[in-house]
Amino acid sequence: MSELLSFALFLASVLIYAWKAGRNTWWFAATLTVLGLFVVLNITLFASDYFTGDGINDAVLYTLTNSLTGAGVSKYILPGIGIVLGLTAVFGALGWILRRRRHHPHHFGYSLLALLLALGSVDASPAFRQITELVKSQSRDGDPDFAAYYKEPSKTIPDPKLNLVYIYGESLERTYFDNEAFPDLTPELGALKNEGLDFSHTQQLPGTDYTIAGMVASQCGIPLFAPFEGNASASVSSFFPQNICLGDILKNSGYQNYFVQGANLRFAGKDVFLKSHGFDHLFGSEELKSVVADPHYRNDWGFYDDTVLDEAWKKFEELSRSGQRFSLFTLTVDTHHPDGFISRTCNRKKYDFDGKPNQSFSAVSCSQENIATFINKIKASPWFKDTVIVVSSDHLAMNNTAWKYLNKQDRNNLFFVIRGDKPQQETLAVKRNTMDNGATVLDILGGDNYLGLGRSSLSGQSMSEIFLNIKEKTLAWKPDIIRLWKFPKEMKEFTIDQQKNMIAFSGSHFRLPLLLRVSDKRVEPLPESEYSAPLRFQLADFAPRDNFVWVDRCYKMAQLWAPELALSTNWCVSQGQLGGQQIVQHVDKTTWKGKTAFKDTVIDMARYKGNVDTLKIVDNDIRYKADSFIFNVAGAPEEVKQFSGISRPESWGRWSNAQLGDEVKIEYKHPLPKKFDLVITAKAYGNNASRPIPVRVGNEEQTLVLGNEVTTTTLHFDNPTDADTLVIVPPEPVSTNEGNILGHSPRKLGIGMVEIKVVEREG
């Protein structure tokens, strides 16, 4: 209803101003600005919906100020360009319409009415309401009743008798199991769901809407609200350190806790969270690659679900035979947005909807088959009678190729329980949320029926039943939940440990690199993660007088304030204000101690603008002074005009990447010498080793042969045509996820370059 009202007010404002207001520059500018704000708000809502599937939620506050990288980002580029072009066209059309009768005399009354209607359209828009509520949640002091509802359970389960298998299905919401809406999509797992305790109304709340947040909510009974962006939690050293979570209780009760997934454990800090709360045995992509049957059988995120669940079954067998009380948690990944992945062993590889194949539905159908196979193995085993199996979605599906069909249904998270000791078949329609999952499991295992804000759905009353406005209530509790981190409010001294790549201050520890915004009563950490912008881009968003401490590789800050460190990959500390003074210190000891030293200086806006502009220079446009191309730092020597076909810098150098160009091309600003030696320090990847690699300058071609280890080769070139471009052609680029950023499409690697140097020969 509010959408229709806001649009009607918008349309009325446009028509009244265009046909009645007449000519007046001030009123035109004011009305266009407010109407433009309406357009921007609604496009923001549309774009947020596209990425999150849930409008402008808590995570969008970070998306607006950080670049979006991660899984399938390339698939979002075209829609993003479309939004920008559409916005430009709408503004142009809006300005043209409003000035249709600019030659008519100005009418104050109609101008005022048009402006008021425009303001009303903004106020009535859902986007404005969502943003207002989010901003309020950032500035509240908390809610006084939080302490009354947040309850810590007993730290142990008296006389535990059951083992626990807990399966998180990535984005595998209960909506997929509606056989009327999606016929025969989930027959195998759906049949198992119907054999157990099926909780049909598990809603998603703020702070529970992405994987690590869903895990925290289900195991600790609280949303993941933190003094930093949730997926950046990989940088912290402990996770809600004061809270009692399900894993803590299990460990205290004699359980050995295991977690198995196909992706890297460091992503979003899952390893930190689990280690902080009772899990001593963690297996991710790095740990599994030496034990799986085919270490090369991977998708963009890690190992496929069939591989992961096979390893989980092996672990279940091993632990069951040992007689040790255990919990085994596992997380699938094949149903990750935007498209999902199809395991090669499942029978259900294709699902058609609306008369055409749908990749997301196909991934769901395949993944549920793999999960069902795993569960049926457990059910057929002699240990099932001592086991509780839990299946839940980590969160609702985000914007995938099935999302528009899901949105037509009443959407809920998946949560069902299969008890080997006491088979129960029932569908429970009680209102509940993800925070109730851990409390329900704890209750079944013989512990308390409450956990944080969660309550057992078998013997307690969910917050979703107590509060009709539970989403708003959850946001009201946000400051109280953030305070549970016990995060420091000041930073005066700090210590950098180079062996551990950590920074410590005021009792808190963070992984490097790290950016901190420091004010009188608040320290805001801004870590670097797969889903956030590089720290220098985040720093560029700081206000001129914001105090910062930035710990990163020296070359990243050298172009601004320490050019002598432009080629250094050591750690450096920079602090100051973008509009004031900045200092850069080289971390030259294994354990390095520093102090904050912010000065109240006069702000220079020209200096501020220069710093911001420099911080925003993209990596490939950075230039440094050197007599060779050093590949383990960003940018290129000043003599290089442009380059292509080269991947990002890594600690040792850079790979060629055929996804960015079939050839490595380095174009210099001036012609290369008439006679020169080309000194190449490099290695080959995979089948490119021991193969002739063409290297061309103008019409002349030499051959380079590399092995899998780094070597230095000198090639002799004559350049009679004054060519200015060096071309290297890897013979057989290999598609691989090795060394890739989690969630990115595979790179096609050919040669790994450490250094290339042009040395002019006499004569």
Curated annotation (Swiss-Prot):
Belongs to the OpgB family. GO terms for cellular component: plasma membrane. It is a multi-pass membrane protein. It catalyses: a phosphatidylglycerol + a membrane-derived-oligosaccharide D-glucose = a 1,2-diacyl-sn-glycerol + a membrane-derived-oligosaccharide 6-(glycerophospho)-D-glucose. It is found in: Cell inner membrane. One of its GO terms (molecular function) is phosphatidylglycerol-membrane-oligosaccharide glycerophosphotransferase activity. One of its GO terms (biological process) is glucan biosynthetic process. Its main location: membrane. The chain crosses the membrane at residues 1-21, 26-46, 77-97, 108-128. It is an enzyme of class 2 (transferase). It comes from the Bacteria. This is Phosphoglycerol transferase I. Keywords: Cell inner membrane, Cell membrane, Membrane, Transferase, Transmembrane, Transmembrane helix. Transfers a phosphoglycerol residue from phosphatidylglycerol to the membrane-bound nascent glucan backbones. Pathway: Glycan metabolism; osmoregulated periplasmic glucan (OPG) biosynthesis. Its EC number is 2.7.8.20. The keyword Cell membrane applies. InterPro entries: Alkaline_phosphatase_core_sf, DUF7024, OpgB, OpgB/LTA_synthase_biosynth, Sulfatase_N.
